[in-house]
A protein has these predicted regions:
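N-terminal phosphate-binding caps/lids of nucleotide- and nucleic-acid-binding domains
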Residues: 1-173
């Protein structure tokens, strides 16, 4: 029927979902096989960097800078890509709040502002960030799929992410 998406489109959605699950749960071993071909395999060894290698390949994995930040209400860990691996769209901007893959304009802006002047215009960075925060500071019920979130302390969230990204990019040799 005309309402069914093509097999390729569906496979693309599944592939993306598997990548998001593997990246947000490096402690779990995933193997995704499509048409007898292994599309994704992760070891479950707790290493986000190894999952990034499995999903995105060596070129990306080699160009990562590790970030770690903590304040009284949030913790940020993960990797930001060196500016030279930026891309023409936002598909490489992945971040997880309390283990859940989400989208949020404030986080996206903080990340991209952190790269200002370091990537060309209309280029977007590679990031894989795990953000942990208290549930009281977070509203996940904005969207039925819980993909969008809102924060009680938007300014503090922006500042923490911006400074974490900016610092690692500008203080490297």
């Amino acid at each position: 029927s005309k309402f069914l998406k093509s097999d390729m489109t569906e496979a693309g959605y599944i592939n993306t979902l598997m990548e998001q699950l593997a990246l947000s749960h490096p402690e779990i071993s995933f193997k995704y096989i499509q048409n007898r071909q292994v599309k994704l395999s992760s070891s479950g060894n707790y290493s986000v960097k190894d999952v990034i290698y499995s999903v995105y390949g060596r070129e990306i994995a080699k160009a990562l800078l590790e970030v770690s930040y903590e304040n009284d209400f949030m913790k940020i860990e993960g990797f930001v890509g060196k500016p030279e691996i930026s891309r023409g769209n936002r598909t490489f901007e992945n971040y997880y709040i309390n283990g859940r893959y989400v989208k949020n304009k404030i986080i996206t802006k903080a990340i991209e502002d952190g790269y200002k002047g370091l990537v060309m215009q209309h280029k977007f960075p590679f990031v894989s960030l795990r953000i942990e925060m208290d549930g009281n500071d977070l509203d996940v019920n904005v969207h039925p799929a819980k993909r969008e979130v809102r924060f009680a302390r938007e300014t503090e969230v922006y500042t923490a992410i911006y400074e974490t990204v900016r610092k690692v990019l500008t203080h490297r040799e």
